[in-house]
């Protein structure tokens, strides 16, 4: 029950503090030390813990700590349990706290090349984050975090989830909630994995104890009175719980039989009558979201929303999840072109282009010619593909790495449309480079760790890299502002300036929407001088997706969350965030006047020693082209 140490145990079992424990309560806790599972007072067989308590009390008499008279009094007392289950699911930033716990464990157990602990106590052992009195200083701003969590809940629970249920309700019954084109074998495989991975199936198949949640190694099969059971074996350190054993046919029947159950409904649970199988399908149709917000000048993470409800969905969609990023990757392609001599005002053909057998299209047509600025504002696929073809996939990959993308990228033309599967963590870090004068600062969430005496045992030392010239970075900001401001007559992010509940933000904002193939993932990246924020929305299973592009595009899924979030942040007088414009680099006007470079090679001499140039403009396809019909969003 996560009762670690006497303080925690006193709270969990008796709802008190150590100084207030009675003799009989103390004896019961001491009795548990040898085998907490066997002597646990919460077991159905209460006689075990009472007998164990009696042993401890008798030892106290033996060694003079208790009189015979008091022994008789305490021996006859009831258990007096006031159970308080410990849960880390509630409270602010639960996803972040779990990532923090794992990172602290990594830091405190880090070793040098010789295998010695880098940070250790005076006795040479590793620090324990729970018991050694450490002080951990993080970058999270609780006020910004509260607004972020509220924004995710507001859009999904009140608007988007209902629209999604309605949108997919028209699907064939046998396919629900998956898209109609899914192959039977794929649907069956996904459902089989979901069934076997469910807690109910793991319990019924003897892989998990229903009481203490111990895994298979603690569980034994037993037979009694002609029936088979599973037992969480006490001889193996289990809790002694027993439950009926079923064969596969019995398990299948259970999964198809409606029972009273609670199902998730954003922000709450509702009681219903549903079969376990239909419950799995229902929960696969739940939309998920993540948000991360960074201060670009420091790399400090101010808000981290890894999902919609940590109690029910533990998977973190900021750090752990990797999803196709869609058009949010296009700014890196455009930045490569600017870095190698293009200008925001340059006209670029949007006519269809084929690179090998890959021929991307634009959603709703839209060919002809565009300026670089307006092509990005309208997320024109063929322009991104043409720029990738002209300036080379290797140069785009090179820049992406300098901007903090650590996940290996597919060196294929369709990378220009965002076929790469990346974590939100990396995308926000890369995008924040544009708002920080071209300087990439690795996103950081731990500032320092102090021991109980106040000595610093760890201090963050993030990677810092001048990935882009400040002038190029400022050009990118001006182009991404057109996505939101509508200065090109349109833009995929212009609804941020509209009249919807989440919109109407008047302050300078740059941005980029993203929508992946078949409306699977919706993204929005929003940039202001003091905060760069990324939002992802989608179902956990990529085969569960919107039918309608109008509903599934990033402008309708991710952007509203960003809008709700920033409106709250701007309205909070306790949060000191700039409402001004992005700072123009010194000498930028001269840079614009003098920028008349006609070849990538000349630009290389002027700007950067580490810029990789492929003069032929040809793309080296080191991997099979992934291909995509990624939407123009």
Regions found by a protein language model. Name each.
Residues 2, 19, 23-35, 102-113, ...:
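Glycine-rich, acidic and aromatic/proline-enriched surface loops and short helix-turn segments
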Residues 16-19, 84-96, 342-396, 440, ...:
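Conserved catalytic neighborhood of penicillin-recognizing serine enzymes
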């Amino acid at each position: 029950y996560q009762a670690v140490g006497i303080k925690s145990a006193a709270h969990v079992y008796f709802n008190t503090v150590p100084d207030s424990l009675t003799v009989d309560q103390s004896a019961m806790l001491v009795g548990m030390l040898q085998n907490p599972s066997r002597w646990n007072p919460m077991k159905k067989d209460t006689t075990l813990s009472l007998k164990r308590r009696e042993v401890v009390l008798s030892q106290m008499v033996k060694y003079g700590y208790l009189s015979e008279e008091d022994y008789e009094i305490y021996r006859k007392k009831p258990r007096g349990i006031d159970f308080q289950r410990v849960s880390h699911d509630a409270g602010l930033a639960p996803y972040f706290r779990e990532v923090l716990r794992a990172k602290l464990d990594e830091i405190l157990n880090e070793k040098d090349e010789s295998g010695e602990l880098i940070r250790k106590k005076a006795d040479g052992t590793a620090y324990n984050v729970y018991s050694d009195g450490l002080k951990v200083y993080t970058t999270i701003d609780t006020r910004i975090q509260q607004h972020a969590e509220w924004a995710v809940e507001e859009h999904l629970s009140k608007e988007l989830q209902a629209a999604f249920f309605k949108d997919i309700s028209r699907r064939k019954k046998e396919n629900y909630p998956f898209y109609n084109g899914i192959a039977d074998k794929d649907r069956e495989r996904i459902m089989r994995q979901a069934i076997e991975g469910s807690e109910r199936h793991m319990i019924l198949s003897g892989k998990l104890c229903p009481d203490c949640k111990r895994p298979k190694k603690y569980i034994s099969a037993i037979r009694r009175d002609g029936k088979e059971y599973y037992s969480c074996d006490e001889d193996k350190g289990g809790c002694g719980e027993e439950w009926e054993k079923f064969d596969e046919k019995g398990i299948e029947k259970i999964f198809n039989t409606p029972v009273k159950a609670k199902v998730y409904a954003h922000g709450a649970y509702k009681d219903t009558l549903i079969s376990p199988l239909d419950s799995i399908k229902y929960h696969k149709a739940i939309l998920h979201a993540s948000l991360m917000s960074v201060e670009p000048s420091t790399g400090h993470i101010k808000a981290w929303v890894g999902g919609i409800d940590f109690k029910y969905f533990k998977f973190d969609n900021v750090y752990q999840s990797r999803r196709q990023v869609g058009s949010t990757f296009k700014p890196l392609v455009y930045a490569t072109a600017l870095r190698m001599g293009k200008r925001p005002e340059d006209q670029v053909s949007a006519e269809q282009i084929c690179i090998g057998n890959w021929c991307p299209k634009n959603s709703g047509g839209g060919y002809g010619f565009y300026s670089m600025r307006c092509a990005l504002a309208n997320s024109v696929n063929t322009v991104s593909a043409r720029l990738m073809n002209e300036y080379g996939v290797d140069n785009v990959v090179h820049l992406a790495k300098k901007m903090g993308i650590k996940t290996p990228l597919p060196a294929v033309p369709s990378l220009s449309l965002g076929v790469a599967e990346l974590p939100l963590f990396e995308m926000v870090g890369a995008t924040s480079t544009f708002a920080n004068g071209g300087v990439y600062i690795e996103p950081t969430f731990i500032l320092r760790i102090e021991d109980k005496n106040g000595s610093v045992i760890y201090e963050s030392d993030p990677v810092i890299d001048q990935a882009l010239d400040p002038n190029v970075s400022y050009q990118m900001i001006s182009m991404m502002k057109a996505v939101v401001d509508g200065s090109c007559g349109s833009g995929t992010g212009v609804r941020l300036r509209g009249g919807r509940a989440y919109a109407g933000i008047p302050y300078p904002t740059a941005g980029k929407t993203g929508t992946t193939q078949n409306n699977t993932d919706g993204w929005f990246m929003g940039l202001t001088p003091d905060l760069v924020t990324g939002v992802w929305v989608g179902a956990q299973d990529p085969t569960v997706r919107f039918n309608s592009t109008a509903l599934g595009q990033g402008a309708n899924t991710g952007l509203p969350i960003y809008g709700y979030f920033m409106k709250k942040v701007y309205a909070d007088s306790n949060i000191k965030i700039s409402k001004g414009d992005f700072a123009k680099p010194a000498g930028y006007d001269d840079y614009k006047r003098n920028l008349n470079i006609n070849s990538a090679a000349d630009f290389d001499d002027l700007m950067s020693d580490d810029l990789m140039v492929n003069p032929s403009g040809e793309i080296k396809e080191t991997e099979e082209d992934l291909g995509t019909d990624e939407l123009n969003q």
